[in-house]
Structures are given as structure tokens and as C-alpha cells.
Amino acid sequence: MLTERQLLVLHAIVDDYVRSAEPVGSRSISKREDIPYSPATIRNEMADLEELGFLEKPHSSAGRVPSQQGYRYYVDHLLSPHRLTVAERAGLSRLTTARLQAMEEVFQESARILSEMTSYVSIVLGPESINERLRHIQIIPMSNQKAVVILVSENGHVENRLVQVDENVTPSDLERTVNLLNERLVGTPLSSLQRKLNTELAQLFKAHINNYEHILHMLQQSMVPASGEKLFFSGKTNLMEQPEFQDVEKMRLLYKALEEENLLQKWLRAQQTDGLHVSIGQENELEAFESCSVITASYAIDGRHVGTLGVIGPTRMEYKRMIKVVDSLSKDLTKRLTGFER
């Protein structure tokens, strides 16, 4: 259990180090109005905090910096709520006021807003479309015997599939096909479309559509299940501006991890719990993020948690503000998706 004096000193060191990125000395802390102690007293407390594992002393420096344990204690016990400024509220409101037609645009705009407001890397894990149900299907003929098959899910997720159309297939064939598909497949999970097409619709096509074999083959191509969730990033270069990431090898590992989408999806799914989650340093399972802090929050559609958004930055992070921004945007995203035009 830390004493009141140790709590004040730890709080001051974290605040000063987050702001300056320089080791904090006892003299600079003693000049703060909220610290009524002499430099000598503060030095003693800093030594005790270091011994307890809350502070670290960088080589060739008289000052101290917070350790991972120090940051964790700070986040869990010392943070006070952050009140959004007028500018921050305006930045967040862009998500609910922007004219966005597709769900993917909403996710990308969320990532963009988050990276701009935090100056860190932002990441949004979209919902797993394979579990969604079909709301509508459309086939739009293109030139050169091609067409676009558009699948719209009940959650507003849109998938476009470019397919080859046999020269014998007529516009009236396509129109009858679309009518049958919407009549029989609406409400079907996207993952089951191909199976239902081959079992239930094949005979209907044979009875009602000319050139049904060509159309059946075309639709089989378009209804291959999607690979799963999509990741949306913004601000990947932001970390290069942070002093902690001037090390080329550290940045290389981080960039490599950000390119491994399957690994990131698995990692983010593991954090997809109700509410907000803060991982500091080596608490992150991915080795490339051991020098980072990650703040994530889940978002929902119609009360069901379907995805995660968050920021990746240095452990020297303005936690109070970042937590509020991530939490607020997750709630705004939930509102936007729940009210998505259907």
C-alpha cells in the first residue's frame, strides 16, 4: 500500500514524463504547486518507489521514469475522469454527422477520427460478416460480359463480387434470377448461401430460367463465403513521431505486426469483451507491442457486441484523455451502426 506522499509523487512523475518524454527529477517535482515537499524528501520517496518497482532509473540520468507497474497502478488507481473539450466533442461528432453510405465507410472514418484525435495508430475490427444474414441481393450487368453481384446483410454490410456472365444470358434471365434470389434467400446466413443455392434453388432455376446452368455457375462464384472480419487502420506513421520509436528495429517489428492481419484479428477478438480494456507493455501478448500501450473498446449492433476499436501508442501515453476518446468513439460507433439505414 502506497502512502499519500508516494501517491502524489508517482502521479506527478507520470504526468511530467508523459508531457516531456524526459526523466523526471526531484527538483522539478518540488516546483509543482500540488507537491508541498522538499527535493530531499521527494528524492527519498522516489528511491522507495523505485525499490517497490513503480519507477525506473534510466542509465546516465538522475531522474526517474514510470515502470510498467507504475503505469498500471496509475491507470487503475490514480486517474480522474477526463472531460472532453469543445474541440474533442466536435471531432467525435464527425462520425454521427458524416454522410456515409456503406458500413465499411463508417469503420474507416472511425479509424481516421481516432488516429487524428490521438496521434497514434488506430485500428477497427469490423464484424464477422460470415455470421450475418442476407437482406437483399442485386445483380448489375456491366460491359464485356461481366456483372457485379451485390450482397447486403441485415446489418448494412455490403459485399460486391465481380463475376463473368455467359454471352447467352439475357437481361430478363438476370431479372428473374434476382427476383427468385430475394424471394428465397433473404434471412439466410451469408455462410449458407452457397449451400442453399445448390440444394433448394437449382431446381427452381431449371424450371423458370433459361440458361440456368450458366447463371447457377455464375452465382456459385459470387457466393463463396467471405474470409471474415476486416481490419481498418489509420495513422500507421504516427508512431514515428514519438521518441520511443526512433529505434529502427523496434519500428520494423511494429510495422511487421501491423501487416499480419490474421494475427491482429485473433488478438483483437481475444480482447472483445464488454467495456474498455487497457494493456500496458508486456501485458500485450504480441511481442512487437511490448513497448506499447493498447486501449480498446467494444462496439455493438442492436445490443450485440460485434467488434473492437482502439489505439496503439507508447506506454508514455496520456491515459486519461485516450481512455475517454476511445470509450466515447465506441459509443458513437454503436449509435451510428444501430441507426444505420436499413
From Swiss-Prot:
Stored InterPro entries: GAF-like_dom_sf (IPR029016), HrcA (IPR002571), HrcA_C (IPR021153), WH-like_DNA-bd_sf (IPR036388), WH_DNA-bd_sf (IPR036390), WHTH_HrcA_DNA-bd (IPR005104), WHTH_transcript_rep_HrcA_IDD (IPR023120)
Lineage: superkingdom: Bacteria
Annotated S-S bridges: none
GO biological process: negative regulation of DNA-templated transcription
Signal peptide region: none
Keywords: Repressor, Stress response, Transcription, Transcription regulation
One matching Pfam family: HrcA
Gene Ontology molecular-function annotations: DNA binding
The protein's role, per its UniProt record: Negative regulator of class I heat shock genes (grpE-dnaK-dnaJ and groELS operons). Prevents heat-shock induction of these operons.
Membership in a protein family: Belongs to the HrcA family.
Protein name: Heat-inducible transcription repressor HrcA
Species: Shouchella clausii (strain KSM-K16) (Alkalihalobacillus clausii)
Gene: hrcA
